[in-house]
């Protein structure tokens, strides 16, 4: 796994919103696309934060009006990111260490270019053929 890079397994079909997007609209984006997170970006596509299904637990618990509340109120801003050139082993280790399921893939010039998830990693591992046991 050490020689396999994030670019090989990441999803480039990304879903983004802006910090002023309403929570209701972000939730609709996630539901319509069957995804567990949206990345929050500025006008130049640089990452500002991430909003995940876990954040909606807090939104529901606080009973905030979802049609009036921007995602900036609930998004995580201290986001651990990776690059397309990073080893998937390093990314997997970081995801386990921090207990999260989504890692945005960023490029210094282009901003957000993809997402790698625990599902992406599991999908890759399930397609890798293991060597046969020595006889």
Regions found by a protein language model. Name each.
Residues 1-12, 52-81, 87-98, 112-135:
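Tandem CBS (Bateman) regulatory domains
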Residues 17-34, 41, 82-99, 106, ...:
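The conserved cystathionine-beta-synthase
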Residues 30-33, 38-54, 95, 103-119:
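A glycine-centered beta-loop-beta connector
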